[in-house]
């Protein structure tokens, strides 16, 4: 009988339970498991960005179960900052190989390809001034870069943190893997959480910066855009961006390729594949592998708190930047632009545009801002990719 109890004790001593409850740093595992459960709750019950928060949350859950060894960070984050292919071959598991798509910058451009097949640039083409609102909303990126530098982050880390202000998860992941891969988990979680909280974060800022009269402005219907314009737009944008800022070419190019596939109407089968099956598969791989990087050792520190605070500042300043420029355009056009559409310049598509619509209808039930707000919204997608290219060009 004694031998049986001895064996049971030895099994327990080598279990994850013992690591959590009877080791000095075991509490960190418990905290991370709690955080993972919160993310899963937000995804499942509150339905906040469930397509990404669910796989990220479950990846976080898996990687913080002691002794499972599901992900080996030292393969990717080391003194050389290059992949240790020898260690990958000898010790790598499934998640390590899936994470190669993140580390090598494969998944975010493919996500952009899928987004392109679902994006309608007609509101932007019909009203090119929307591009200015999309650009103004990127103010949060560069404002937060300065704030991160003041807190002692390096240029690379500050650039990766600042990109949260673009409200574009794939772009944030892409920039972080290029500039500060050791911060990937914290930045990805912050970026997607704030994207999910757009309806909570934006309205108070929008109302604080606009008057009731401005919120009631009714905009005239935009002009009709021809099929030729829709086909030429992605081609022209790709050429201009790639020649001006090569580091943004892959993100913008994939976005525009997806859109050209959609607008041309000649490759319907692969358009559906890119926007559905391919994008769904990549989303699973991206979310789960990023979640697996959020282990207790790299996530539970003061830097994560600073990133969360800086992230919400970035988002708030970006929203304010778009609204303020919207107010300027309202004055310049003698009241033809509703400043509320400026908040849609962040690239949370189409959620930010829906927020503009909702706030506008609170003050004028007959006001329909959704299509007008989609112009700055899709401009924000391009703007965040261009901002990413600038940061990578300067600090990569």
What residue ranges belong to the model's regions?
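Hydrophobic transmembrane alpha-helices of secondary-active transporters
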Residues: 39, 99-125, 258-261, 279-301
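N-terminal alpha-helical transmembrane segments of multi-pass membrane transport
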Residues: 1-77, 90
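Entry/N-cap segments of selected transmembrane alpha helices
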Residues: 124-145, 295-322, 373-377
